Swiss-Prot record:
GO biological process, one term: translation
Source organism of this protein record: Bacteroides thetaiotaomicron (strain ATCC 29148 / DSM 2079 / JCM 5827 / CCUG 10774 / NCTC 10582 / VPI-5482 / E50)
Protein name: Large ribosomal subunit protein uL14
Chain's role: Binds to 23S rRNA. Forms part of two intersubunit bridges in the 70S ribosome.
Stored Gene3D superfamilies: Ribosomal protein L14 (2.40.150.20)
Length: 121
């Protein structure tokens, strides 16, 4: 459950470490985003000598949330942190690696996040 001003961990090797949600995409008055949703973020901290600069505005795909997700079979899944991966202008993942597990719900997004992730829960 990500909203404007939420801070997320960036879990790919694009060079960003932390990002701030500045817009939830998908409707005029939409307040919250969950796993599989695309948001607009501002990069808040980066590793040295990365191609992503601090303050850069980018789109991001949410891959983990602390708020639990209800599955159709009635089970729930939640993660320890809120995490995202940065996207380029074409909507593809900017990095080439993903760190940490991702939710199975990302299969519906038709992105290569699931194939890059070390574990899918």
């Amino acid at each position: 459950m990500i909203q404007v001003e939420s801070r997320l961990t960036v879990c790919d090797n694009s060079g960003a470490k932390e990002a701030l949600c500045i817009r939830v995409l998908g409707g005029t008055g939409r307040r919250y985003a969950s796993v599989g949703d695309v948001i607009v973020v501002s990069v808040k901290s980066v590793i040295p000598s990365s191609d992503v600069k601090k303050g850069a505005v980018s789109k991001a795909l949410i891959v983990r949330t602390k708020k639990e997700i209800r599955r159709p079979d009635g089970s729930y899944i939640r993660f320890d942190d809120n995490a995202c991966v940065l996207l380029n202008n074409a909507g593809e993942i900017r990095g080439s690696r993903i760190f940490g597990p991702v939710a199975r719900e990302l299969r519906a997004t038709n992105m290569k996040v699931v194939s890059l992730a070390p574990e899918v829960l």
